[in-house]
Amino acid sequence: MFITGSHKGCPYNFQDVKKSNIVSIGLRAKTARAIAVVLGGTIEAPLVLAKLEIALADPKIPATAQPYHEVMDLSWEESQKAVRKSTAAIEAIARKALGRLIKKLQVDGMRVSGVGIVGAKDRDLARIGNYHIRAHAAEGVLFRRVLDLAADANGLKRRTFSDRELDQIAVNELGAKSGGVKRKLNDLGRTLPPPWRADEKQATTAAWLVLHGPRK
């Protein structure tokens, strides 16, 4: 069973998972949105149950889409203060959106074992001299961080991965068990409707790393 689509009030039609009710969620942070994958099955034979896009911005609050671009002309210290209101709004959006997904899964008899989050890692943004590049970098960190906070607020076990380090972590932890991480991801993609891009694969990999696994 799989579902594709956007996250609008969690309008999903999940079916019961027959073999196991344990699932994990993988999230790939993007600007103003996240690619989400719900993964079931086992470590050796994972199964994509759903893939969808979660909105992390409110069209009624334009600044939530690219908050640092809105204050790009300010110094780093001033921009940090200026984005507080929009950042708080984004945090609330992420918390509620993830909560709706978790609730839907639970209503359908599934137990969420944890969430894996992929995105830009923390860095010293103040050292970036170009304001436009800094705005993009800051938003990359922000939209990953709000997913971290959303997972914590919803009481989920969480692992967070740098997008640049995820592949090597997956090889180290899953390679021997999966018979080849890339091959398995490609095999999973053949059973699903498009899209099946790098973002969906990264979200799936993150979910795979927390499926039935201990907290890291």
Enumerate the predicted regions with their spans.
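Short hydrophobic transmembrane-like helices used for membrane targeting/insertion
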Residues: M1-I3, V17
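Phosphate- and other anionic-substrate recognition elements at nucleic-acid/protein interfaces
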Residues: D16-K216
